[in-house]
UniProtKB/Swiss-Prot annotation:
Keyword Membrane (UniProt): yes
Record keywords: Membrane, Transmembrane, Transmembrane helix
Membrane topology: Single-pass membrane protein
Keyword Transmembrane assigned: yes
Highest rank taxon of the organism: Eukaryota
GO CC aspect terms: membrane
Signal peptide segment: none
Region (Disordered), start-end ranges: 70-93
Major localization listed first in the record, in broad terms: membrane
TM regions (residue ranges): 14-34
Localization: Membrane
Name of the featured protein: Small integral membrane protein 36
Length: 93
């Protein structure tokens, strides 16, 4: 007596799809372990990563002029009792 299991084509396609995703996941995990999860080749030597203190600071300088003729050129603004004195402002990032 012959015994075989008949599988529906939709079920077979689903099994193949799940198996292919499992294989892709395993390949990804193995490559992640081999390449240190950062895309770097472990057989090569890389320079050490630079720290944040070694980066040069960026200085932003904003200059405001207090000419009355250019008031309407700047656009609408909110007027308060004591407007802040205009001048040179700088921010170090």
């Amino acid at each position: 007596m012959e015994f075989y299991l008949e599988i529906d084509p939709v079920t077979l396609n689903l099994i193949i799809l799940v198996a292919s995703y499992v294989i892709l996941l395993l390949v990804f995990l193995v490559s992640c372990v081999l390449y240190d999860c950062r895309g770097k080749d472990p057989s090569k030597e890389y320079a050490p990563e630079s720290t944040l203190n070694a980066q040069p600071s960026i200085r932003v300088v904003v200059t405001q002029h207090s000419a009355h003729a250019s008031h309407w050129a700047r656009g609408p603004s909110l007027h308060l009792k004591d407007p802040a004195p205009l001048g040179k402002k700088s921010t170090v990032v």
